[in-house]
Curated annotation (Swiss-Prot):
Keywords: 4Fe-4S, Cytoplasm, Disulfide bond, Iron, Iron-sulfur, Metal-binding, Methyltransferase, rRNA processing, S-adenosyl-L-methionine, Transferase, tRNA processing. It is found in: Cytoplasm. Its main location: cytoplasm. Disulfide bonds join C108-C337. Binds 1 [4Fe-4S] cluster. The cluster is coordinated with 3 cysteines and an exchangeable S-adenosyl-L-methionine. The gene is rlmN1. Belongs to the radical SAM superfamily. RlmN family. This is Probable dual-specificity RNA methyltransferase RlmN 1.
Amino acid sequence: MKIPPISILSHTSESYANAISHELGKGFQHAKLVYQEWFRRGNISGLNPAFKNAQALLQNILSLTDFSFLPISQNLTDGQTGKFLIKTIDDLDIKSVLIPMQAGGTLCISSQIGCQMGCAFCETGRMGLLRNLTTQEILSQLFIAKFRLHFSVRNIVFMGMGEPFDNYDTVMHAFRILTDSHGFGLGNNRITISTSGCLEGIYRLLQETTPLPNLAVSLNAPNDELRNKLMPINKKYPLKELYQAIYDFCKQTSKQVLIAYVLIKEQNDSIEHAKQLTNFLSGLNVKINLIPYNPQSRDRFQSPEQSTLENFTSYLREKGFYTLLRQTKGQKIMAACGQLGNLELKRKKPFILPILKE
């Protein structure tokens, strides 16, 4: 029986080396060298000196390894922000966003195709959930950004398509690969996981024994009545429970939580809303990221006037909250916050992925 290929993008260095040595009966340290070369350079062309006297072993390791990553189907830029699409084997699109910065850029990656959270202001939510991404599909996004598009990745944010905690096990496995010192070697504080308020995910995260990523919470409303309308998850986890989860995360990790708040004209953008927001966030170690609403394919909302954005921001700052008003980028290529959707995929049937050896 033919041995299924071992997908290198689905493994930490330890589990990859274990899988190789299990099949060959040797080669643990040599497999780690292959892993390190692939993740740090994007190819294995520099391995020959390390395998000078073990060419047969190298060929055996390579024959057992699946080095494949998904192809780019589209690569767009508006001069400030980039967006690339990856085509999956079941003919779906994974969307990722590149945000250049002076000291290295931020890569916004997806954890699902579609999303079942149904947030009223989000194009992805209107798709519904088609399926979770695999570890290989999540890691392909970074691999392509770094080695095919030559984008300098300093930070990674799970803020693309999907609710990361709805695909918890895979996202956390990807996190461990991203932070593997023999691989990409990103620091845990360079990675942020954003949630719409999935409390099980927050509390599962607190039970992890390894260093944790940063946490962002997409809040978008300062009271239950409004949040119920904008974010259906609030009906399951109302603000009182969400507050406690944020408080517990801050206390147990000593980390500051990022609060994302999409400002929507005449919905959640008044000074009264700002007052309610400061009252809700009182006592929490947070910073606030204000995001002007971005237009979608079938709009029911609008972005506030610039004066409204500035007044809302000023009020929060006056109350002592560290607040950033995000500059709108990526609208023209549908790469801005809330725009990563494809309603044409909504009617696609689920597809069973072939199993790679893990």
